[in-house]
Swiss-Prot record:
<dbReference type="GO" id="GO:1990904">
    <property type="term" value="C:ribonucleoprotein complex"/>
</dbReference>
<dbReference type="Pfam" id="PF00453">
    <property type="entry name" value="Ribosomal_L20"/>
</dbReference>
<dbReference type="GO" id="GO:0009507">
    <property type="term" value="C:chloroplast"/>
</dbReference>
<keyword id="KW-0699">rRNA-binding</keyword>
<dbReference type="GO" id="GO:0003735">
    <property type="term" value="F:structural constituent of ribosome"/>
</dbReference>
<keyword id="KW-0934">Plastid</keyword>
<dbReference type="InterPro" id="IPR005813">
    <property type="entry name" value="Ribosomal_bL20"/>
</dbReference>
<dbReference type="GO" id="GO:0005840">
    <property type="term" value="C:ribosome"/>
</dbReference>
<keyword id="KW-0689">Ribosomal protein</keyword>
<dbReference type="GO" id="GO:0006412">
    <property type="term" value="P:translation"/>
</dbReference>
<dbReference type="InterPro" id="IPR035566">
    <property type="entry name" value="Ribosomal_protein_bL20_C"/>
</dbReference>
<keyword id="KW-0687">Ribonucleoprotein</keyword>
<dbReference type="GO" id="GO:0019843">
    <property type="term" value="F:rRNA binding"/>
</dbReference>
<protein>
    <recommendedName>
        <fullName>Large ribosomal subunit protein bL20c</fullName>
    </recommendedName>
</protein>
<comment type="function">
    <text>Binds directly to 23S ribosomal RNA and is necessary for the in vitro assembly process of the 50S ribosomal subunit. It is not involved in the protein synthesizing functions of that subunit.</text>
</comment>
<keyword id="KW-0150">Chloroplast</keyword>
<keyword id="KW-0694">RNA-binding</keyword>
Length: 117
């Protein structure tokens, strides 16, 4: 049986793995086996955190809306219910942006929602 030299193929695969873990510390960015383990862990974390980011932003929007709505003596759940019943097509992201950037517009949205029901 002839000898198979895998230098080019193996080097290409190793370099691809080492490129993924370029910012890691110590052996995780220099040696292939620890780098491969680190790359798998990194990809798993990034997959998990993409979904986590959506959850975190929703929490942030709810907190901002709640803080603004409390100034008008209305609870968060009541405000969302009123806005949905008045058929306003505003999601939590838009409401949070309006609450932070333009408080008077948010006030008019809330009063319109209260008086339309």
């Amino acid at each position: 049986m002839t000898r198979v030299k895998r230098g080019y193929v193996a080097r290409k695969r190793h370099n691809r793995i080492l490129k993924l873990t370029a910012g890691s510390k110590r052996a995780h960015s220099r040696l292939v086996r620890p780098a491969q383990q680190q790359a798998m862990k990194t990809l798993a974390y990034s997959h998990r955190d993409r979904n986590r980011r959506k959850r975190d932003f929703r929490h942030l929007w709810i907190a901002r809306i709640n803080a603004t709505v409390r100034q008008y003596d209305v609870s968060y759940s009541q405000a969302i219910s009123l806005i949905q019943k008045s058929k306003m097509l505003l999601n939590r992201k838009m409401l949070a942006q309006i609450a932070v950037l333009d408080n008077s517009s948010f006030n008019s949205i809330l009063t319109a929602a209260i008086y339309s029901t």
